[in-house]
Every structure is written in C-alpha cells, then in structure tokens.
Amino acid sequence: MAKNYTVADVVNIDSDSDSDDDNGGVIGMVPSLASLIENQKVSIADAATVAPRETLECRSFWKAGENFVIPSSVTLTAIGMVEHARVHPKFLHSNATSHKWAFGAIAELLDNAVDEIQNGATVVKIDKINIVKDNTPALVFQDNGGGMDPNGIRKCMSLGYSSKKSNTTIGQYGNGFKTSTMRLGADAMVFSRSTRGGKSTQSIGLLSYTFLRKTGQDDVIVPMIDFDISSDSPQPIIYGSPGDWSTNLNILLKWSPFSTMVELLQQFEDIGTHGTKVIIYNLWLNDEGIYELSFDDDDVDIRLRDENAQDGKRLHAKTLEVRSHISYRYRHSLRAYISMLYLKKFKNFKIILRGVSVAQFNIADEFRHPETIMYKPQAAAVDYAATGIKVGFIKEAPKLPICGFNVYHKNRLIRPFWKVVLEGSTRGNGVMGVLEANFIEPAHDKQDFERSSLFLRLEARLKRITSDYWQNHCHIFGYQTAQIPADKSKRTVIPDQPPTVNTYNPSPLPSDRISHGGPIIREINLSNATSSRTAAVAAPHLRNYTGLRNNFQPVQLNPQPPAAGDTGNNLVGKLAAEIREENLQLFMRCEEYVKKENEVEQTVKSLEKELEEIKSKCAQLALLVDAKKKEMQQV
C-alpha cells in the first residue's frame, strides 16, 4: 500500500550556509535550469509539461549518435549568466562508445558499489523491473553504501569529476557512471539518500539522452531536485528560485518512468536511511530490433545474445564442452562474468543478481600442479614490489584447448583469459595463470591495459612462463618434448647425404607421435632406428614466425659413440644449440612485430578518424564565428 507523501512548502536554502566548503563550490556553479532552457529557445512548457513518455526514433546504441542536428547559429548567453564552454549531448553518446562490450559497462557500475564498502556497504543488487508507463524493461542497480548528498550527486553527474583518491578504489577518472549508463540505455535516474553533518537529505537526478535529443539542446542539462528529510516530512531544498525547482520536478515527471511525486518518493522506500539506486531505462536494441540484454533466457541471470549459437542444430561434443567452460560463458552470462570479476573474496559484501547471490570464483583454486612464480617489474624511476603469478593446468586439461592469464588490477579483473602464446599453437594448452598487476594502468573501459613498456615486458615474461611450465609439465598428460640430446659427441652430419631442400609434406600423425616440444624439431625419421635418427632442422635464414618450415638441413643424431678422430661433432653440436636458441628468439620477436604492426594500423585509422572529426568541428566553428561577426556588426 502506497504511503501518502506530503511535501512541505518550498524553502529557500542558501548554498553558502552549508558548512561543507565543497558544497558551495559545486552547487554554486550550477546555473538556473529555467534560464538554461529559455536560453536554448525551447519552451519550458514543452520541456516540462507532463505527457506520455517519449523515446528516440533510433534505439540502436551504435546508431544513436547519427543525424544529430548541430545548431547553425550561435547560442546567446542569458543576461547575468557566466559564459561557459558547452558539452554537446552528442558527447555523451561518443564517450560511451569506449564500452564495446555491454558487460564492461555493468562492471563499471558494480565498481562504484564495491568502492562504497569503505563507507559501510554490504550489498549491491542488480535486477530488472518493468516500466509501468509502457511496459518496457529497465535495469536497476542498488547499494546500501553511504549515499550521496546534493553536492555528491552533482559531482557524480558531472563530467570528469572524481573524488576517489584511495589506492584501493577502482574508479579514478570520474567518467564511469556517465559512460556505463549511456552504454546500457538512453536514460538513467539516480535516487540517493545520505546523512552528512547531522543533516539527512535525499536527491533525484536525471541524465536523459532522450530529453536532450527531443528538446534540441546543445548543452548537457541534468535536472535534479533535493529534499531535506531531517524532519517528519521532506522539505524541498532550493538553490535558485521556487520556479526553477518546480521546473526541475516537472521535467523529471515528463521524461522519467514516474508520473507523480508520490511515485518518485516511493523509490526511496527500499533504500533505507542511506544508499543509492540507479534505474536505467530505454535500454538499447541490437540491429535486429531486440534488446541487447536478454532477461528471459535465465530467470536468475542477465545474458548477452550469443551470435554463434546455432538454434536447432546439434553441436559437436567437443564444441559443447568448450562452450560450457567459464572462458566462453563469461562473454554471454553476467553471472559467470561477475563471479570472477574480483580477485579477493568479499567478507561482508554480497552481489545479488536477480534475487540470487553470486558465488565468487577464482580459477586458480582449481589448478592442477600449481606453482607460484614471483615477478618484479623493472622500471627506471619506480621500485615496484614483486607480485606472485599463480600458474597451473586447468582441471579440464588436456581435453580442452584453453589457456591464458586472468590479469587483475586493484582486485578488479581487467583482461580475462589473455592468451599470450601464438594463436593456433598447441604448445601451452591447458596452462592458465592468475596475477594482480597493479604496476600497469588499465584503459578507460577497464577491459584492457595501456600499451606501456611495463606491459610489453610483462607480456614477454608471461610467454616465457607459459613455455617453461609447459616444457616441464606436459609429460604428465602424455605429451612429449622432442629435444636434441645434450651429449654433443653423439651428433654427426650424415656423410653420404649432402644438404638439400626437404620437400616432404608431413601427413597428420597420431597423438603419440606428435612433437609438442620446441619449434626446432619438426620431423623424426625412425626407419633406421637401430643405427641412427634423422632430424630435420631449418636453417636460420629459412625460418618464419608462422612455424611453417619448408626447408630443412638433414642432421643425423647417432646414438653410437663416434669414431675416434671425428673432429666435426663438437661443431655440429654447438650449431644445433645455437640454432635452437636463435629460433626461439626470432619466433618471439616476429610475434611481437606482428602485434606492433596491428597496433600501428589501428592507431593510424583512429588518427584519421579523429582528423576528420576535427575538420568537421572546425567547419562548424567557422560557421559559428561568421554568425557571431554578423551579430556584432548588426549591434
């Protein structure tokens, strides 16, 4: 049964009266919303009149930034207002495109809740609700942290403001809330309660891309209202005029899922004395016109639609096995992704997804034959502490061809199942690792790391760790590492067979005869096993990084002691060892060069795109300058 809410008469509270210096600093800079809308030449009646909720014509996220009308005339500043640099609403969409993956945006919102653990948060809930106005789904995030006062909610909904200075907090740029909510849906509402300095407040804010697009704004306008709830009935807190507060309220009622003040205030009932609730609605659709996020496939999960799923088709048993592993499931199951999102297990904090708590999972707990290798990053200016790299075989080894490293930063998973070995290689199958790399910086979307020198050194080290671990342990599962014998005296060049190009095209061999060792030995001829073995070793100048060696120099590995006076044995032994070492080095270098080449190509494309955008902006600015000059001449 709904409560009967009564709101006291509007009271005018001067922001300077707050004891917190920061309050005046932020709230004092917020211009009058009514004057902003009037300045945009959009009728307040049109913007705030309560009517059926509107939506964007284009509901696909990747197309929602297209066909945005850029005003051709200069927007004048209202009398008495300070001229300010405008942030066009299109920036909200462009900024959110940093999240290529929708689950990455959800993880950003979870990070905000986890950062609230230091303020007493014990739970964060993620759920789906239905909007009564149009019966569409909405995504809800709710935590019981310290909440936000009027000053805090304005910082949250401002661009690029971050108050997180702790070394343990995940957020740092002050951009995550805007990019993540906009990536998931066109509109977001924030409800927050807090107690600061003995005064209890509750605040409501609306970040609506739909509102900004539909009303033709050329500046990001965020309507917000605040209440003082220290007494029995909530009292509106006014920082401008009563008319401005009413305008904010009317815009909230028109463009939000709630039609009345009672419905708005009901959203605080399950928050308690402190906490925050975020409702994201007008969720994005995919190119097929259906919601990106699926709520119907699993009642206790939120899923991304799997484009590789073959409805009605029987899949190979091995394919089903691979797709049942968490290395595949996390891409489409939010529950699977969240389960390994944080490295250390929480003691007094729960993540509840659609009514069911998420069990944390660390794949290192299931390693077979685990080892811990200490790694100390080397840098010229900073002395970093050593970090432990846990490495081992997954429990499904050797059946599943899965390998890689889960790399965390400040307890948060940044790069899951990072495969550092050459794609398509069987060397390293089943080898997994887990580490926390606080010495490298994550990218803005927290799904990768910045390509620094420390990152490249770590990548090279992880390749070596994978290779060494495989070399030392692959025999456990029946793999063989074919190596040239250490006794150099047993190596002789075949006397009656001059070096020639080997055109042999090997056919697939049974598993017990496949070499899983280093990339040197490619062919073993056992036709004359009683007296000698013939190993084909590629010459250094004929090797390539793909692992295909089409040219060989036959070398005989003679198990019998050489004849006295054979002076060529030591030379051949040294040559083979040098070839093996050189081959490994060239192999790794070529792989790195290919990656660097791809990175350079991506950088060039990005810069070309950025150049085109800058040219377009310059043209628009030129038009604005011309219009301004004409106005000045008329004056």
Curated annotation (Swiss-Prot):
Residues 491-511 are annotated as: Disordered. Its main location: nucleus. Keywords: ATP-binding, Chromatin regulator, Coiled coil, DNA damage, DNA repair, DNA-binding, Endonuclease, Endosome, Hydrolase, Hypersensitive response, Nuclease, Nucleotide-binding, Nucleus, Plant defense, RNA-binding, RNA-mediated gene silencing. Residues 588-635 form a coiled coil. It is found in: Nucleus; Endosome. GO terms for molecular function: ATP binding; ATP hydrolysis activity; DNA binding; endonuclease activity; RNA binding. It comes from the Eukaryota. Its EC number is 3.6.-.-. Its cofactor is Mg(2+); Mn(2+). Uses preferentially Mn(2+) and, to a lesser extent, Mg(2+) as cofactors. Disulfide bonds: none annotated. Disruption phenotype: Loss of ATPase activity. Increased sensitivity to turnip crinkle virus (TCV) leading to spreading hypersensitive response (HR) and impaired control of viral replication and spread. Suppression of HR-like cell death induced by Pseudomonas syringae avrRpt2. Suppression of lesion formation and partial suppression of stunted growth of ssi4 mutant. In the double mutant crt1-2 crh1-1, compromised resistance to avirulent Pseudomonas syringae and Hyaloperonospora arabidopsidis associated with compromised cytosolic calcium accumulation upon infection. SUPFAM superfamilies: ATPase domain of HSP90 chaperone/DNA topoisomerase II/histidine kinase. Expressed constitutively. It holds the Pfam family HATPase_c_3. GO terms for biological process: chromatin organization; defense response to virus; DNA repair; plant-type hypersensitive response; positive regulation of defense response to bacterium; positive regulation of defense response to virus by host; positive regulation of plant-type hypersensitive response; positive regulation of systemic acquired resistance. One of its GO terms (cellular component) is endosome. PANTHER family: PROTEIN MICRORCHIDIA 1-RELATED, ZINC FINGER CW-TYPE COILED-COIL DOMAIN PROTEIN 3. Homodimer and heterodimer with MORC6. Component of an RNA-directed DNA methylation (RdDM) complex that contains at least MORC6, MORC1/CRT1, MORC2, SWI3D and SUVH9. Binds directly to SUVH2 and SUVH9. Interacts with the resistance proteins RCY1, RPM1, SNC1, RPP8, SSI4 and RPS2. The interactions with various resistance proteins are disrupted when these resistance proteins are activated. Interacts with the PAMP recognition receptor FLS2. Belongs to the MORC ATPase protein family. Mediator of defense signaling triggered by distinct classes of R proteins. Required during hypersensitive response (HR) that confers disease resistance to turnip crinkle virus (TCV). Exhibits ATPase activity. Contributes to resistance against Pseudomonas syringae and Hyaloperonospora arabidopsidis, at early stages prior to cytosolic calcium ions Ca(2+) accumulation. Required for pathogen-associated molecular pattern (PAMP)-triggered immunity (PTI), basal resistance, non-host resistance and systemic acquired resistance (SAR). This is Protein MICRORCHIDIA 1.
